[in-house]
Regions:
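Alpha-helical architecture feature
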Residues: 1-26, 35-43, 53-170
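Short coil/turn linkers that connect adjacent helices within long alpha-helical scaffolds
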Residues: 29-30, 47-50
Length: 170
């Protein structure tokens, strides 16, 4: 856990909050704290470097867990997804045309992971299954494609459930 804390720029004093976030997310998703810790081992350095919050990262991990993508598989997928979200996200489809999703704020800082993924979900909602697969592969690669599609296909109720309780611990 201390490695993940350090990666997010947190201190030992934040360990209680970090544990609360993991516990809340895991209790609302098909995963557990141990598997979430394994996932964080792989993706926390990238998440922290990009300025993504522990809360948003835990939400994404929980949503992947609901799709059966857990532990190291989720960690490597999350790491790849986050790495590929460092520039503008370019998507295309017959119904949406060419779309660009900004990943940075006007000051150059990264937008929140939840906001970026929410915008991607809107774009993916207007695509055929084939377009979703093609865009996911082009954006994050074949190895992370299943994890990314799990995030894109998450039901609004699942997103609310996974994020709901963890926001109360912030």
């Amino acid at each position: 856990m201390t490695d993940a804390l350090t990666a997010f720029g947190l201190t030992a004093a934040d360990s209680g909050h970090f544990a609360d976030v993991l516990a809340a997310a895991s209790s609302n998703a098909n995963t557990n704290v141990s598997m979430m810790g394994e996932t964080f081992k792989y993706c926390a350095p990238v998440a922290g470097a990009l300025g993504f919050s522990v809360e948003d990262t835990a939400e994404a991990i929980g949503l992947m867990g609901n799709a059966g993508i857990k532990a190291s598989q989720a960690g490597t997928s999350m790491r790849s997804i986050m790495t590929n979200l460092t520039g503008d996200v370019k998507l295309s489809g017959a119904a949406i045309g060419d779309a660009t999703i900004a990943t940075t704020n006007a000051d150059g800082s990264m937008r929140s992971l939840s906001a970026i993924l929410a915008d991607c979900r809107v774009a993916f909602g207007g695509m055929t299954e084939a377009e979703k697969a093609n865009n996911a592969e082009a954006l994050v690669g074949k190895n992370a494609m299943s994890g990314f599609l799990a995030l894109m296909n998450a039901a609004p109720e699942d997103i609310a459930k996974v994020s709901g309780d963890r926001k109360s611990v912030v």
